[in-house]
Amino acid sequence: MKSKKQTKLLLILDGWGYSETIQNNAIALANTPVWDKLNQTFLHSLIHTSGKDVGLPGKQMGNSEVGHLNLGAGRIVKQDFTRIYNELQNGDFFRNPILKNSLEYANDNNKAVHIMGLLSDGGVHSHEEQIHAMLEMTHKQGCKNVYLHLFTDGRDCAQKSAEKYIQKFEEKMAILGTGEIVSIIGRYFSMDRDNRWSRIRCAYELIAKGKAKFLAQSALHAVELAYARGETDEFIQSTSIKIPISIKKGDVLIFMNYRADRARQITRAFTDENLQGFSRGTFVPTQFICLTEYKKDFNLPVAYPSSKLNNVLGKYLSNLGMTQLRIAETEKYAHVTFFLNGGVEQAFNGEDRILIPSPDVATYDLQPEMSAFELTDALIESIESQKYDLIICNFANTDMVGHSGKLNATIKAVETIDSCLGIIHKAMFAISGEILITADHGNAEQMINPKTHEVHTAHTNNPVPLIFVSERKADISEPEKGALSDIAPTLLAMMDIEKPNEMTGNSLLTFK
């Protein structure tokens, strides 16, 4: 008979930030008796999740990919955004061999160059400066037919901000005398990650075939028409500009998003000959270029390949023969697996995974509970089994509902999490387990932009809570100075395991 484990649990409350402002703060306005009691009873602090603390430039807000990479790595991980940003500054971007070769191929074979990506300064999935730079590169290389397929944001920036990004881009095109915006579509369709292939199909048919729901005379006109229909940027329906343009066999298609999770499905639509999600009709092969590595087994040219992270938390525990569980609903499953494991897709030895399907609704404000209760049921069963040394669980609600910008729905999401926390605490107390509660970034604590007074749907730069739920006596080593890179060393300290040399983060707990 296997011995029962003294399970440690890391709870990641996605998008649960901290702000002293009460107004428009869904977390402060919610009824959270369990959360309040945990804060009153147990050791707690705040940690940092944005900018240089997580390997991003300056004051760039954090996000789930960046957060989970840092959580699992136990060190500050220099992000793709930062790598590319630095190369834009020193000019190396324009010498990137993969990008240069693709443009040379287009010139030599009289092929068009298509550039697609999310046009905003949100910095979570892409950045407008990088798309501007790609356009400049086509100009420097003398490319003739350069077509832009732009995704509008409205989620990692203001809901109706597309016009300013498009105006800047059109000014860049005018200066260079290169490029033509031929299609516009909201990220809701082009960047799905939850196998809602009907959305991806809308984007694919627009970009590949020029088949659109609407026709506009310019990109700005497309946005104007969308607003008149009551759509915000995230939800702009497929629109062709002037004359529909289709992709021809052998054309170059460069995808300028750098974050993997929302890039995978649309990439598969263009590159997977055996695509199961929807019928494309005749498959048209392209010279598809990924800005970063979206998935190893895609076997596609990558401008900025991933660098390997050694001795991340999951691998380190696996090498020690320990057992671990990763559990989340669909929307955050990749984060507690792929990203937390440093970009490794396959589970490590001794690592189990449980995926709880996210509800099939258009937007999560329609069901703010999401699948939190089903997730909690599965988590409780795993806790009671006492077969795991470490369980890592992500609750998606405060981030996914927070992105809707709907305050009342987000309050409901917070209260759902609070109910689940009560059940989880009881189960962990029964087995004498310990819980570390934190978040990957803020979101739900700021539902209105305090400067513009517009609905705020993006992440924040606010710190996030840290609570150590245990009967054990401990102190916070450096109150309010910690970062996400300190979480893995903290978990190892809770398990009485020395951290590996690669982990430069430090335990936030000192045990008495």
Swiss-Prot record:
Pathway: Carbohydrate degradation; glycolysis; pyruvate from D-glyceraldehyde 3-phosphate: step 3/5
Molecular function terms, GO-annotated: manganese ion binding; phosphoglycerate mutase activity
Catalytic activity: (2R)-2-phosphoglycerate = (2R)-3-phosphoglycerate
GO cellular component, one term: cytosol
Binding-site positions, Mn(2+) 1: 399, 403, 459
EC number: 5.4.2.12
Cofactor note: Binds 2 manganese ions per subunit.
List of catalytic residues: 64
Gene Ontology BP annotations: glucose catabolic process; glycolytic process
InterPro entries tied to this protein: Alkaline_phosphatase_core_sf, BPG-indep_PGM_N, Metalloenzyme, PGAM_B_sf, Pgm_bpd_ind
Keywords: Glycolysis, Isomerase, Manganese, Metal-binding
Binding of Mn(2+) 2, residues: 14, 64, 440-441
Entry superkingdom: Bacteria
Cofactor: Mn(2+)
Residues holding substrate: 125, 155-156, 187, 193, 259-262, 332
Quaternary structure and partners: Monomer.
Record-stated family: Belongs to the BPG-independent phosphoglycerate mutase family.
Protein name, per record: 2,3-bisphosphoglycerate-independent phosphoglycerate mutase
Originating species: Ruthia magnifica subsp. Calyptogena magnifica
